[in-house]
C-alpha cells in the first residue's frame, strides 16, 4: 500500500525546489546542534528530524510566551520558521534532493504558552501549512500540538518532524 499522496516519480528532479522558488520560499542555513545530539537520524525509510527552534540563520525570533509576549499570529510565523529550519535539515539529510520525500508522517509542535493559553493547534498550523504547500498531499501528516512551560532560549515555538523518504 502506498503512503497517502505518494506519486511515482517521472524521473524529473528538483520539483520540490521549483515549488519552493515559485512560492518565494527561501530556506535558512541548517543550524548546528546546540548540545550533544544530531540534527537527524535515518532508520530505513524513516527520517527523524530533531526539534527546530524559531530562528533564522542562528538569530532567534519570537521570544516569550504565546498569549502574553507573543501573539497567536506571531507564533504561527514562529512555527513556520521552525518548519523552514526542518526543511533545511531535511535537504541536507537527503543530499539536496527533497523529491525523495514520500510522506511527512508526523509533526510534533511545542508552544511556550502562558498558563491560560489554549490555541496551541492554531500555532502549529504554521508548520503544517508549510509542509502542505511544499509537498502537496505528501505533506499531510499526523500531529501533536502541546503547550509547555518553557523552551530553550525562551523561544515561543519548537517543531520536530518525521518523514518517510526513498533511496
Stretches with model-predicted labels:
Residues 2-167:
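Short, polar/acidic, helix-capping and beta-turn segments at strand->helix junctions
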